[in-house]
Amino acid sequence: MKTTPRILEVRTRILKKNDEIARGMRRDFEQFGLLVVNMVSSPGTGKTAFLKETLTRLAACGEPSAAVVGDLETDNDARRLAESGVPVRQINTHGLCHLEAEMVAEHLAGWNLAGLRYLFIENVGNLVCPTSWDLGESLRVALLSVTEGEDKPLKYPGLFNTADLAVI
């Protein structure tokens, strides 16, 4: 008698712990009335310049804002954003290509989130890895520059399918 092989699919969410932390953060953010924006783009697209201008304008309008910056190494971008006058914290991933909810949660410790209206997360410059990691954000924004080519949404559907907004 010939038997047909059976395939048993077991799907375990690899990112389960991250998702649990992100859900808790999202609940906290919502309780505080805090809008959290996760900015995702390629390296060199202009995330930092775009965010610095945004933070500067929000500060000028009296809107309490802050930023968390993810980068492999250095605090260059965090120092640039701090020029806007808002609180900024740096997360160095030391080679990791994305931020994780736990990293963000640790770097938010001690901040009066209830006193903020906007929190921006400048994710590590990468169009692939950050897509899978929920950071508890209200909005995910994909930022791309014209010089990167018009086919980015086709090459990186994961990001553009999960983004709430794309800025060119």
Go through the PLM ranges and name each one.
Residues 4-27, 31-34, 54-138, 148-151, ...:
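Nucleotide-state-sensitive switch-loop elements of NTP-binding domains
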Residues 39:
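Hydrophobic anchor at the beta1->P-loop junction of P-loop NTPases
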Residues 43:
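The conserved Walker
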Residues 47:
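Conserved lysine of the Walker
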Residues 50:
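Hydrophobic positions on the alpha1 helix immediately C-terminal to the Walker A/P-loop
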Residues 66, 141-143, 160-168:
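Conserved beta-strand/loop subsegment of P-loop NTPase cores
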Residues 156:
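Acidic, amphipathic alpha-helical patches
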